Amino acid sequence: MRLNIAIDGPAGAGKSTIAKLVAKKFRLMYINTGAMYRAVTLMAMRQNIRANDVKKLCDLIESLSMHFENDKLIVNGEDVSEEILLPKTSQNVSDYASVLEVREKLVYLQKKMAGRYDVVMDGRDIGTVVLNDAPFKFYLTATPEERAKRRYKELSAKNIKVCYDDILNDIIRRDYIDSNREVNPLTKAYDAVEIDSSNMCIEEVVDYIVQYISKKI
């Protein structure tokens, strides 16, 4: 049995941190699909390509070489792991990620990666689209306020100046866009295990997932 693990959920739910730790526990490759959409957003903004300029966006993606290296995302030889987390990228990523052609191209790349290795993959549409046949699917959620608090702490720890209210408003806005877009909206897979981590620490969520999987394999 392929040990592919899909972890979905809204912005700031802790998907990346938890997925990374789960991957380490089972010695699997970790693929952060959200980082890939953020990278496209970053590169598009650098070149002043708008989200509605589909042809230029597609050409841009074709020119990008993306791979993960020790939890870092390398794009055309550049480590963009820190820059893609900046507020400017966060505020625009939903607009670019909602473009059909962008999602088609990145989903193709993500499926290709998962076809080569057993993976832990996190995002918005992993359990429903990218790894819809994954044997293990989880949907992480938490209140918008708790998610904003976590993101604020994460960015502040990296000495990035941010405002809690701005983060909260951005999370609420992204929740709406991600859940209502026409292409692969954020939805919980029917066979996914839902985990509300509002009152759970990271270790508790990781332990729950690891124990759940360990009992099945």
Curated annotation (Swiss-Prot):
Q: Might you give the EC number(s) for this enzyme? A: 2.7.4.25
Chain positions recorded as ATP binding sites:
G9, P10, A11, G12, A13, G14, K15, S16, T17
User: Which InterPro entries did the record assign?
Assistant: Cytidylate_kin, Cytidylate_kinase_dom, P-loop_NTPase
Q: Which UniProt keywords apply?
A: ATP-binding, Cytoplasm, Kinase, Nucleotide-binding, Transferase
Highest taxon of the source?
Bacteria
Give Gene Ontology CC terms.
cytosol
The kind of enzyme this is, by top-level EC class, is transferase
**GO terms for biological process?**
nucleobase-containing small molecule interconversion; pyrimidine nucleotide metabolic process
Recorded GO MF terms: ATP binding; CMP kinase activity; dCMP kinase activity
Report the transmembrane regions from the record.
none
Localized where?
Cytoplasm
Q: Which reaction does it catalyse?
A: CMP + ATP = CDP + ADP; dCMP + ATP = dCDP + ADP
Keyword Nucleotide-binding listed: yes
Q: Does the keyword Protein transport apply?
A: no
Database matches in Pfam families: Cytidylate_kin (PF02224)
Family assignment? Belongs to the cytidylate kinase family. Type 1 subfamily.
Question: Per its record, how is this protein called by name?
Answer: Cytidylate kinase
Q: Which organism is it from?
A: Clostridium acetobutylicum (strain ATCC 824 / DSM 792 / JCM 1419 / IAM 19013 / LMG 5710 / NBRC 13948 / NRRL B-527 / VKM B-1787 / 2291 / W)
